[in-house]
Amino acid sequence: MEHQIITQNVYAPDTEAKLDVARKLFAQFDSNKNGTLDPSEVAGLIKTTFENMGVKDYSVTADDVKLYMKSVDVDNNGLVSYSEYEEYVIACLKKAGFDCEVKQKVKRSAKKRDAATEMKLDVARRLFAKYDSDKSGQLEEKEVYGVITETYKQMGMDYKPTEADVKLWMSMTDTDKNGTVSIVEYEDFVISGLKKAGFMVKEFTQA
């Protein structure tokens, strides 16, 4: 089965840090986890944005929401998608003097999931890109050692994988048994781990 692969932009560390805050805010107010914000959810996002800037007890008006929707809802469907939101945040960061030049493009599955899950996957995608040394879009066994080592490191553990560890990891991740792990297989493996850990994952179709 063919899976569509797309690319995702990675920015300078300071810019990515701000985007991480924005992603968490989007995930917080995407209450039904459908990957979009409706006007009522946008009102909560605006209020929290003001609070984060030190403006307490700000009363969000209908005009505030309309103005925000006009600026962000590019396709005018009455909803703010995550991609529209991120483009708006990047434009604001650029105006504020942040470096918004794309530093790297990482491959990812075209599947769309809720923003909280996407934040987890963003970390995994960058890890995949880092150890895909020949940029083939596939991880070979020799590249998997680094992935496993850094995964443990992110959990605060200094662990060096053995050959048996790598072969076990490959057996769980390489679902088509072609000897390499694609970004789609890797994302599916990460999603499976998140679900086992009790993390709610929602996939949806969005144009």
Swiss-Prot record:
PANTHER family linked: CALBINDIN (PTHR19972), CALBINDIN-32 (PTHR19972:SF10)
Described function: Expected to play a crucial role in calcium-dependent regulation of ciliary movement.
UniProt keyword annotations, A-Z: Calcium, Metal-binding, Repeat
EF-hand domain: residues covered: 17-52, 60-95, 119-154, 161-196
Originating organism: Tetrahymena thermophila
SUPFAM superfamilies: EF-hand
Residues annotated for Ca(2+) 1 binding in this entry: 30, 32, 34, 36, 41
Record Pfam families: EF-hand_7
Protein name: 23 kDa calcium-binding protein
Residues that, per the record, bind Ca(2+) 4: 174, 176, 178, 180, 185
